[in-house]
Each structure stands twice: as C-alpha cells, then as structure tokens.
Amino acid sequence: MDITDQTIEYVSTLAKLSLQPEEKEKAKKDLGNILGYIDKMKELNTDGIEPMSHVLPMKNVFREDVVTNEENREELLKNAPKQMDGCFMVPKTVD
C-alpha cells in the first residue's frame, strides 16, 4: 500500500512525534506493510468463526471469595508498618 508524506506527517503529528527524514521513510514503509497485511486479512473468510478476546482459551483460575466474620484485629495489625489506637497509620496523601 502506498503511503504519502502527508499521511506520515499527519500520523506523526497525532502521535506527537518529531521524525527525521530517514525515520519518515522507514515509517512510510512500515505503515504500508501494516496496512497491506490488514488488507490481506480482510480477504479471509471468517464465516462461522466465533470471535474471541484471547488467542488461548482463558478461564478464571482464582479461588472463590469466602466471606468470614473474624475479629483478628491484632493479627491484621501485625502487618502494619505503623499503627495507632488499633488502626493502620498511613502517610498523608492530600494536602
């Protein structure tokens, strides 16, 4: 696919890139190859093929959450770098 200098200028402006002349030539070639590949993909017959969000079949492998009503405040506070009056102390984040 043929890419013009104006197209490269437009795309580089959108991407906030400042390209040198040799970089523009390489970008023209690369963008042309990418668009050519996309055109080739458009020729594929995808009838009956179910869309997918991942290349590999994915499933959630995490454990189920289990709600418990435990009172282990002291045990939890052992993990706190700082504590005061039974509460976690954290650095101030807002002035």
Swiss-Prot record:
Its subunit composition reads: Heterotrimer of A, B and C subunits.
Source organism of the structure:
Lachnoclostridium phytofermentans (strain ATCC 700394 / DSM 18823 / ISDg) (Clostridium phytofermentans)
User: Does the UniProt entry include the keyword Nucleus?
Assistant: no
Q: Which GO terms describe its biological process?
A: glutaminyl-tRNAGln biosynthesis via transamidation; regulation of translational fidelity; translation
* Superkingdom classification of source: Bacteria
The protein's Enzyme Commission number: 6.3.5.-
The protein's job, in short, is: Allows the formation of correctly charged Asn-tRNA(Asn) or Gln-tRNA(Gln) through the transamidation of misacylated Asp-tRNA(Asn) or Glu-tRNA(Gln) in organisms which lack either or both of asparaginyl-tRNA or glutaminyl-tRNA synthetases. The reaction takes place in the presence of glutamine and ATP through an activated phospho-Asp-tRNA(Asn) or phospho-Glu-tRNA(Gln).
Identify which top EC class this enzyme belongs to.
Answer: ligase
Originating gene: gatC
Signal peptide residue numbers: none
- InterPro entries for the chain: Asp/Glu-ADT_sf_sub_c, GatC
For this protein, what reaction is catalysed? L-glutamyl-tRNA(Gln) + L-glutamine + ATP + H2O = L-glutaminyl-tRNA(Gln) + L-glutamate + ADP + phosphate + H(+); L-aspartyl-tRNA(Asn) + L-glutamine + ATP + H2O = L-asparaginyl-tRNA(Asn) + L-glutamate + ADP + phosphate + 2 H(+)
Q: Which SUPFAM superfamilies match?
A: Glu-tRNAGln amidotransferase C subunit
What terms describe the molecular function in GO for this protein? Answer: asparaginyl-tRNA synthase (glutamine-hydrolyzing) activity; ATP binding; glutaminyl-tRNA synthase (glutamine-hydrolyzing) activity
What protein am I looking at?
Answer: Aspartyl/glutamyl-tRNA(Asn/Gln) amidotransferase subunit C
